[in-house]
Structures are given as structure tokens and as C-alpha cells.
């Protein structure tokens, strides 16, 4: 990674990682509400859905604010990368970035979408369908803006590449993002409801049973689109060890393998005993390992975005 400030610098990688984490978290919020909770068939379903619906907008608002701040940080970072650290922000330099380049159009899309997310999030507590549709559209537009300034935008068929990368992000959000929302929001909400420890364990078990099949579908989408993008980018297996891009991709795949293996462990070993009162601690440990591995894969992705491919 470059020690000088540029698209490969640590600061730029950190900004992209934050943007990716916000994207995955926001998509995961939609998956939690519209997929996982819709499948929930455990005890106190209406009460649990109501509690999550009350708390979820705060998470969406927080993620939207961080995404908006990171989007502006990306503008400053891009300015330094293009014009150098000695060049101060000016009307001409900002106009060049924001109005005379494809990068600028993508930035406007991301900034507008993030702003709409933060604007609509507090209004989601009213539980209106229109508000949630606006939030979903803004989140999807924000997600779509991410690959528009990376390798997919420079592909031979950029529209297909961007669409595939968007599906890849949706897969990540539906799996990892909804797991994060499940762990940080839905399970604590299940514990906070009135009832004894057995009822709490039953609610948590119901949530995980609702989540597990959807995680399989979304992780399959992540894997299929990732395989397609890998082949499209590299054109074979040899570049996996012959190029910096390929070696970084292998590291990312290693982290994803750990996350997938931990998810399989949760499904096969933890899920069958979740009705027991003390199984929650076991689930919490394994879920944190899965999320940690996924976070490292996300950071690897932030590095990949600015890494030249084998044919560049």
C-alpha cells in the first residue's frame, strides 16, 4: 500500500472501507425488516417486530450520517489525490472534480442518496410504506454508486459489471449486514421483551431460524457474483498468484471462507440447541467471529478497489 496519499493510501482505503461497511449495514437493515422479520414465526412476533421497527430507524440514521460524512471525506481525499496536498480547495478544483468528470457525477449520486437516507430515517418510526420505499430506493442508489467509481466502471461492459457488483453488495448486505443487525439490534430487542429467560431463548431461536435460510440465499448470491467478477477481471486462475490484485483477492477469499465456515457452524451446531437458556452466549461468540472475518474481507475489498488488475 502506498505511503504517499493516493487512491492506494491507507487513508483512502479506510474511507472506502467505511463506505462499504455503511453500504452493507444499510442493505442489511432492509433485509432484516423485509426478509428476516417477515419470516419470524417465534413467540411474541408482533411485539418483537414492533420493538425492532422502533429501534431500526436509529441505526439507519446513524449509518446514513456516517456514510454522508465518509462521502465528503472521499471528496477531500480525491482532491488531494488528483491535485496534490499542496493545492488548497478552490472553486475551480472542486468544479473540475464535481462537474467535469464521471467521478463527480457518481459522487453527487452517493451524496444525494446518503442525504435522503438521513432525512427519511427519523420518519420511518411512523411505519408508513412510502417512507420505507423512499429509504430502500436511496439505500440501493447509494449502494449502486460504490462500484461506479471502481473497476466495474472501466470494464468492457460497464453497465453489466456495475449491476453484477450491485448484486454482489446486496448479497453481502443480506448475509453479513443482516447478521450485524440481528446481533446488534434484533437479538437485544428479543431479550428486552417481557418474559422469562426461556421465552427470551425461544425468541432468539426463532430469529436465527428465520435468518439462516436467507443467509444461505444471500451468501450464494455473493459467491456467484463474486466468481463471475473474478473471472471477468482476471480471465483465469493464474493471475490469482501472479498479480498483486489476485493475491489480495485470495486474502479476501480466505476471510470470507472463515466467515462462511463460522456461519455453517452456527447453522449445524448452534441453531439446534438455541432453545436452551444459555445457548445465547455461544451464538454471540460465533456470530462475532463471523462478523470479524467479514469485516476483514470488507477491508480487503477496499484495498482491491484501487489495486491494478493483471491486464492493467
Spell out what each predicted region is.
Residues 1-312:
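Polytopic transmembrane helical bundles with strong interfacial aromatic enrichment
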Amino acid at each position: 500500500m502506498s505511503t504517499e496519499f493516493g487512491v492506494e493510501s491507507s487513508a483512502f482505503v479506510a474511507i472506502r472501507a467505511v463506505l462499504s461497511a455503511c453500504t452493507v449495514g444499510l442493505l442489511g437493515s432492509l433485509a432484516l425488516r423485509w426478509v428476516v422479520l417477515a419470516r419470524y414465526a417465534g413467540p411474541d412476533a408482533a411485539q418483537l417486530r414492533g420493538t425492532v421497527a422502533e429501534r431500526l430507524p436509529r441505526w439507519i440514521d446513524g449509518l446514513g450520517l456516517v456514510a454522508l460524512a465518509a462521502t465528503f471525506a472521499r471528496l477531500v481525499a480525491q482532491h488531494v489525490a488528483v491535485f496534490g496536498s499542496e493545492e488548497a480547495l478552490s472553486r475551480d478544483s472542486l468544479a473540475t472534480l464535481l462537474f467535469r468528470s464521471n467521478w463527480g457525477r457518481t459522487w453527487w449520486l452517493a451524496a444525494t442518496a446518503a442525504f435522503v437516507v438521513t432525512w427519511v430515517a427519523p420518519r420511518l418510526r411512523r411505519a408508513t410504506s412510502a417512507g420505507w420505499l423512499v429509504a430502500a430506493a436511496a439505500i440501493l442508489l447509494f449502494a449502486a454508486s460504490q462500484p461506479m467509481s471502481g473497476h466495474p466502471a472501466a470494464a468492457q461492459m460497464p453497465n453489466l459489471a456495475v449491476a453484477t457488483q450491485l448484486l454482489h453488495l446486496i448479497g453481502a448486505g443480506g448475509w453479513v449486514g443482516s447478521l450485524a443487525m440481528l446481533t446488534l439490534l434484533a437479538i437485544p430487542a428479543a431479550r428486552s421483551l417481557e418474559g422469562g429467560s426461556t421465552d427470551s431463548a425461544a425468541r432468539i431461536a426463532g430469529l436465527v431460524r428465520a435468518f439462516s435460510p436467507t443467509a444461505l440465499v444471500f451468501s450464494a448470491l455473493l459467491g456467484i457474483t463474486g466468481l463471475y467478477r473474478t473471472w471477468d477481471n482476471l480471465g483465469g486462475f493464474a493471475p490469482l498468484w501472479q498479480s498483486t490484485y489476485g493475491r489480495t483477492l485470495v486474502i479476501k477469499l480466505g476471510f470470507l471462507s472463515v466467515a462462511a465456515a463460522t456461519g455453517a457452524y452456527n447453522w449445524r451446531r448452534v441453531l439446534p440447541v438455541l432453545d436452551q437458556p444459555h445457548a445465547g452466549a455461544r451464538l454471540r461468540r460465533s456470530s462475532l467471529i463471523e462478523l470479524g472475518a467479514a469485516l476483514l474481507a470488507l477491508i480487503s475489498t477496499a484495498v482491491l478497489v484501487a489495486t491494478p488488475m493483471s491486464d492493467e
